[in-house]
């Protein structure tokens, strides 16, 4: 793919003729990798989820969007509306780069309710004549007719002294009638940080200081912060950049994770345990959370990473969002489970019960490209158990469980075309308890694996041939007694 010029990357969607848009749309629609039950861009590139909220009977889900190709360029917010987080209606581009402050992109932010109206707080990105970045924080209000009206000027016009222009991704939450914004930042020592602001009227924001953690030197930038209380635990989510890999940990180019403990919002001190990754697969970044209509904490992430090329780029589009996950804390541990509403996509239930051994078994009539597969491990005497999905004579996506180490490994070395550059073709995680259950959500070009009822999650894009539809199981030695439940998933291409 030819290199994009600066002029091409910062061309406005509104300035492109309809014929060009139709040509792009036709190219994308012909892609063999299009998903069926994930939010994906109609054309161009999707990245961070933005502005997630349940408001007056509807869910609103937005994402970063560059319309004109599978590269990072002039960013818009593209918004969807839903009643159930399964079926989505496209509203279209809602927050657009149409002022001087956001001339080079409307960057990530969050949604919140204030005086019975929906508001968004976001980062405006501007470049001066020397291409220096200028980051400011803005607010926009959604009117009753759905139109978006920006406040006339920035509510935070510059980062505080001691911090660089890497100052973005405001996440707003309210506590005791006070509005707080957590903002991703970088100090002048090139260390990632989170800054806290407060407001009582959402116009005037007071800088309170830097959130104090024990992660003093933990990457050169922290992106996409999120803060909430879950079952009595304070959770601080962020995405550190510049972390070296440690064995099986931190192998992706950038990380997404959390620290859990107790946060003193007045003194800005976080007493916390270790940083943990939210997802142990290949393709997960920039997660954001919100409360659903029942008060459950829901997480949606970007199923992709910056600075990596994906095979779908050749078809004029890139990336998708993950399925929504419900977060809970159980016995002091974070659990992530797929939302129950996804069950409405299920059709054609099939079940099987039996032993797997060292002779590979093709599970007939189990096959498919878009399905949910639940594997219950009822007895396990095998040293290693192997599960393969999207298999053909030449391709396979392999999940391995090592009983002695309680180690689960996702291997996409034979999954077809691979994103690049990516470190290695496997990702692994060590489970807290022996493997008893796997729940897989497989779409045309992705797999999301929930282990032990939400103990771990592994997410990956796979760019497999459309004829790779088989499902297999076997062991290294010994046998395991398994129950399989499979559903075809029927989603309307979003």
Swiss-Prot record:
GO terms, biological process: sucrose metabolic process
Key words, A-Z? Carbohydrate metabolism, Glycosidase, Hydrolase
- Record bears the keyword Hydrolase: yes
What top-level branch of life does the organism fall under? Bacteria
Pfam families to which the protein is assigned, alphabetical: Glyco_hydro_32C (PF08244), Glyco_hydro_32N (PF00251)
Enzyme class, UniProt record, top EC level: hydrolase
Pathway in which this enzyme or protein is active? Glycan biosynthesis; sucrose metabolism
Which GO molecular function terms does the record list? beta-fructofuranosidase activity
Give yes or no: UniProt keyword Hydrolase.
Answer: yes
Give the annotated active site: 48
* One GO cellular component term: cytoplasm
Q: What is its EC number?
A: 3.2.1.26
Q: Which residues bind substrate?
A: 45-48, 64, 107-108, 168-169, 223
Q: Which reaction does it catalyse?
A: Hydrolysis of terminal non-reducing beta-D-fructofuranoside residues in beta-D-fructofuranosides
Q: What is stated as this protein's family in its record?
A: Belongs to the glycosyl hydrolase 32 family.
| Name by which UniProt lists this protein | Sucrose-6-phosphate hydrolase
Organism this protein belongs to: Staphylococcus xylosus
| Gene behind this protein | scrB
């Amino acid at each position: 793919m030819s290199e994009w010029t600066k002029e091409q990357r910062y061309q406005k969607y509104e300035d492109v003729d309809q014929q060009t848009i139709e040509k792009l749309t036709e190219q994308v629609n012909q892609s063999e990798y299009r998903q069926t039950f994930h939010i994906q861009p109609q054309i161009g590139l999707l990245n961070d989820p933005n502005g997630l909220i349940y408001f007056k009977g509807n869910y609103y889900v937005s994402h970063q969007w560059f319309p004109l190709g599978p590269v990072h360029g002039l960013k818009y917010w593209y918004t969807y509306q839903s009643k159930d987080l399964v079926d989505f209606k496209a509203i279209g581009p809602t927050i657009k780069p149409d002022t001087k402050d956001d001339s080079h992109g409307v960057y990530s932010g969050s949604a919140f309710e204030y005086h019975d109206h929906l508001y968004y707080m976001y980062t405006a990105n501007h470049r001066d004549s020397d291409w220096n970045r200028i980051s400011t924080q803005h607010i926009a209000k959604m009117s009753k007719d759905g139109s978006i009206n920006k406040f006339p000027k920035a509510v935070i016009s510059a980062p505080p002294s001691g911090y660089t222009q890497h100052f973005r991704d405001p996440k707003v939450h309210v506590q005791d009638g006070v509005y707080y914004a957590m903002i991703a930042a970088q100090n002048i020592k090139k260390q990632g940080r989170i800054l806290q602001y407060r407001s009582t009227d959402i116009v005037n924001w007071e800088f309170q200081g830097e959130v104090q953690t024990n992660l003093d030197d933990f990457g050169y930038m922290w992106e996409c912060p999120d803060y909430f209380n879950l079952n009595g635990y304070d959770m601080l989510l962020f995405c550190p950049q510049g972390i070296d890999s440690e064995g099986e940990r931190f192998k992706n180019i950038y990380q997404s994770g959390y620290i859990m403990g107790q946060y003193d919002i007045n003194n800005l001190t976080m007493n916390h345990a270790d940083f943990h990754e939210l997802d142990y697969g290949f393709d997960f970044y920039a997660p954001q959370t919100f409360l659903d209509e029942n008060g459950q904490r829901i997480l949606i992430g970007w199923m992709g990473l910056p600075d990596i090329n994906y095979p779908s780029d050749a078809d004029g589009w890139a990336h998708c969002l993950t399925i929504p996950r419900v977060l809970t804390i159980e016995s002091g541990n974070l659990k992530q489970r797929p939302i129950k509403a996804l069950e409405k996509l299920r059709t054609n239930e099939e079940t099987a019960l039996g032993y797997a051994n060292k002779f590979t078994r093709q599970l007939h009539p189990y096959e498919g490209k878009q399905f949910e597969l639940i594997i219950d491990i009822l007895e396990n005497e095998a040293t290693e158990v192997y599960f393969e999905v999207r298999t053909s004579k030449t391709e396979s996506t392999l999940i391995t469980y090592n009983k002695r180490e309680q180690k689960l490994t996702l291997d996409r070395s034979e999954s077809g075309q691979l994103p690049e550059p990516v470190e290695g073709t496997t990702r692994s995680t060590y489970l807290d308890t022996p493997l008893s259950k796997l729940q897989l959500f497989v779409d045309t070009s992705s797999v999301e694996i929930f282990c032990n009822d939400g103990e771990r999650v592994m997410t990956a894009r796979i760019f497999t041939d459309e004829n790779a539809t088989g499902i297999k199981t076997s062991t290294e030695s010994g046998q395991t007694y398994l129950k399989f439940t499979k559903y075809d998933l029927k989603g309307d291409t979003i």
